[in-house]
Amino acid sequence: MPLLSVKKLTENFDGLCANSNINMEINEGELVGLIGPNGAGKTTLFNMLTGVYVPSEGSIEFTKDDKPIKLNGIKPYKITALGLARTFQNIRLFKDMTVLENVLIAMNKDVDYGVITALLRLPKYYKSEIAMKKKAMELLTIFHLEDKCEELACNLPYGEQRRLEIARAMA
């Protein structure tokens, strides 16, 4: 069963066809590239896959825990929570936050405590925060940014900012 399945995906903007009849399957562990000239519809495809645009026609299915989930019409934040995330062509980091904070902020979907628990600093708050920090540091280690975890994102060179953005998307 494919991890991501796209069938007859089409997107029209007021009569302009940006994508037409796209079909593809991506299996777990595959690394796939999408190449094309400016204006070919690459970003439009990613916007449909991540819920920014609802396709004019066709279907998108993402498999999680061996269950296919139809993504058409699902809000982008819910698609991200399922595990399908994206980065953008332009870097969109929180420049005045640390490298670690940039990854942690992307983990807000994993917060399992309420405002009262956070305000009172109850044990559940600390347990959750420690688990998220551990996961964030694991991601930073994968992207060779663990030694920069306390640096402001704006102080990183461009290549490291891109890696941070990918780590944040994976959080």
Q: What is each stretch, according to the model?
A:
Residues 166:
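Hydrophobic anchor residue at the start of the ABC signature
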Residues 115-148:
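Conserved ABC ATPase "signature" region
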Residues 35-37:
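The feature captures the beta-strand-to-loop junction immediately N-terminal to the Walker
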Residues 59-82, 120-125:
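ABC ATPase NBD Q-loop/coupling interface
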Residues 50:
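Helix-to-loop junction immediately C-terminal to a conserved catalytic motif
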